[in-house]
Amino acid sequence: MAFRRTEGMSMIQALAMTVAEIPVFLYTTFGQSAFSQLRLTPGLRKVLFATALGTVALALAAHQLKRRRRKKKQVGPEMGGEQLGTVPMPILMARKVPSVKKGCSSRRVQSPSSKSNDTLSGISSIEPSKHSGSSHSLASMVVVNSSSPTAACSGSWEARGMEESVPTTDGSAESLYVQGMELFEEALQKWEQALSVGQRGDGGSTPTPGDSLQNPDTASEALSEPESQRREFAEKLESLLHRAYHLQEEFGSTFPSDSMLLDLERTLMLPLTEGSLRLRADDEDSLTSEDSFFSATEIFESLQIGEYPLPLSRPAAAYEEALQLVKEGRVPCRTLRTELLGCYSDQDFLAKLHCVRQAFEGLLEERSNQIFFGEVGRQMVTGLMTKAEKSPKGFLESYEEMLSYALRPETWATTRLELEGRGVACMSFFDIVLDFILMDAFEDLENPPSSVLAVLRNRWLSDSFKETALATACWSVLKAKRRLLMVPDGFISHFYSVSEHVSPVLAFGFLGPKPQLSEVCAFFKHQIVQYLRDMFDLDNVRYTSVPALAEDILQLSRRRSEILLGYLGAPVASSIGLNGPLPRENGPLEELQ
């Protein structure tokens, strides 16, 4: 063999010579006598020649590809070390993603038409304040970390190239999502600025007679531009902002405001209190100053028990006494609603809660107020069921049974034990009706089970099937809870009977595919929450004394009920009575007030 000739030759030449000498080796080994007996046809000779030639070509190609692979492995680490200190660019970009997220949530941009007070996530009000990040993109971060002198001028293009080369993994998808949200928030800022500039231009562009006399050319130019076009552009821009806010609500944390209520009041021309007008004026003035938000935050954080950095807007003797009770730990509470009701701190919420409890206790001592609150609850739920095209007959029967049970003095002790087992700290109207029943129901609707969402989001199922499945799920849950009751025929059992009629309607309204019913339920929830927020606002109600607070709460309740019942198309609860006068014995009656 000719394997000895490989010294001083390349591997390819040695392999070619070896393959070429195979026929000679076979001929010399087996002798000419063996090959002389073979009779090869011309076709067989061609096949053998083609096979030998293909084998040689395949061996050469495999060897050449193997050499190229080795060169790539050697060049890869050298290129990575020359660019960013032996750290590949995709890794740096992946490490920068968390910082971008922090930047997105570090600032807030306030809408020029509303304020951010509310923290409910289920209300379909327009979100005025959005988390907006820095105006710099990820490409600027790459430029900062680059040591090349030309990186500053070509950073954005290099970043785009690197983004295209990054494989579509979970990390890159997350970074692309963050970049998209960042750009979307920047677009929101630009649209908000355009809207505010347009509003300022409309407000200050009205020409006066003096201006027209002094500058007739400019006056004619201002009048030449059609006013309708500017208004149409402003309306389109505002509609675009509203749609963008709703889109951002679906993919991020929301901070809904009470702008829906203010717009409704402006449309219906309902009277506003002096406190709400003053708050609105303060909000409009604060839009021109970015420092006002931070200064207000510092003032709120500095509020402590027994210390008042700034004097209150009005005297609040009852509130100050309640703060002392909170300091002593004598105000129990089941759930803190500090953020939901817009309170400055937990101590502020507890002090106002104590005053509200006392105010409701005084209100419910009068027969007329008992009739009013009982009838408002009946008419609100009846209006909701009517809007949902459901018969309220079953609800009215269960509601009457629950009221008759709650008004019997012999049931109050059992009711107290049942509610204390559920964590209710005080037997008051606020703790039982507003907090335990309404607020807990809204919280449950904000976090529905995944199985329910899967059914409601299935596009292949009809709306009637979804509604039936949701109602069946609600009934099965209530039936299972009824089996675990401590008192089989107590207050909670009667409440479950009412919930069997109301829960499916509310659940399908908040979670279902019908936009009209969803709007009605969202408005209902928004009105209830705003009613509680106004009740816990020192500027809307008087905390000077318990009777004054009770009077303001009653007026606030009448005003909110008129708005809500008017929207639902239900009659206002003014002169319709309950099932008879309440007993006025001392002791047990106070437990339910």
Swiss-Prot record:
Post-translational modification: Phosphorylation at Ser-295 of the FFAT motif activates interaction with MOSPD2.
Lipid bilayer topology: Multi-pass membrane protein
Subcellular location: Mitochondrion outer membrane
GO BP, sorted A to Z: bone development; mitochondrial fusion
Chief place where the protein resides: mitochondrion
Gene inactivation effect: Mitochondrial fragmentation: mitochondria become round and show loss of cristae. Female mice show decreased quality of oocytes. Mice lacking both Miga1 and Miga2 show strongly reduced quality of oocytes and are subfertile.
Keyword terms, alphabetized: Membrane, Mitochondrion, Mitochondrion outer membrane, Phosphoprotein, Transmembrane, Transmembrane helix
Low complexity: compositionally biased ranges: 106-116, 124-134
Transmembrane regions: 11-31, 42-62
Residue positions, PTM Phosphoserine: S132, S220, S224, S228, S276, S295
Sequence positions bearing Phosphothreonine: T206, T273
GO molecular function: protein heterodimerization activity; protein homodimerization activity
Top-level taxon of the source organism: Eukaryota
Motif stretch (FFAT): 292-298
GO CC terms in record: mitochondrial outer membrane; plasma membrane
Positions of region (Disordered): 98-134, 150-171, 197-229
Pfam families: Miga (PF10265)
Record field: compositional bias (Polar residues): 205-218
Subunit structure and binding partners: Homodimer and heterodimer; forms heterodimers with MIGA1. Interacts with PLD6/MitoPLD. Interacts (via phosphorylated FFAT motif) with MOSPD2.
UniProt remark on domains: The FFAT motif is involved in the interaction with MOSPD2 and its phosphorylation regulates this interaction.
Family statement drawn from the similarity comment of this UniProt entry: Belongs to the mitoguardin family.
Primary role: Regulator of mitochondrial fusion. Acts by forming homo- and heterodimers at the mitochondrial outer membrane and facilitating the formation of PLD6/MitoPLD dimers. May act by regulating phospholipid metabolism via PLD6/MitoPLD.
Name of the protein described by the UniProt record: Mitoguardin 2
